[in-house]
Regions:
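Single-stranded nucleic acid-binding surfaces, predominantly the OB-fold ssDNA-binding core
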Residues: 1-109
Length: 109
């Protein structure tokens, strides 16, 4: 079975990395506008909870901030509270220029 989702949205929460038991994570929410069918329709926005782990968590925290636009590939999971969470698996950069980041040092090349 295939469980992949690609999302583009704006980060709606402040970002921080939490480390527990030698694993890091960053929990954040994104707002995604639904496409309008015509010019008179109002824009509807959905909010999704996302989780990034380890290197992805550090990259999200270093490269993005609240209000920033993010694009990523992930998978859907049920959280213990029965809500759906998107697990971030791959970051995708939208800029014209490629960015390479050393996650350990935070250096951008």
């Amino acid at each position: 079975m295939l469980n992949k989702i690609m999302m583009t949205g704006r980060i709606t929460t402040d970002l921080s990395v939490v480390t527990e038991d030698n694993h890091s994570y960053c929990k954040f929410s994104i707002a995604v506008d639904q496409p309008k069918r015509n010019d008179t329709e109002t824009v509807e926005t959905d909010t999704f909870t996302c989780l990034a782990f380890d290197d992805n968590a550090r990259s999200v925290n270093f490269l993005y901030s609240k209000g920033g636009q993010i694009t990523f590939v992930g998978s859907l999971r049920n959280a213990p509270d029965k809500k759906v969470v998107i697990i971030l698996e791959e970051l995708h950069f939208q800029n014209r220029f490629a960015v390479k980041v050393d996650v350990d040092s935070g250096q951008i090349f």
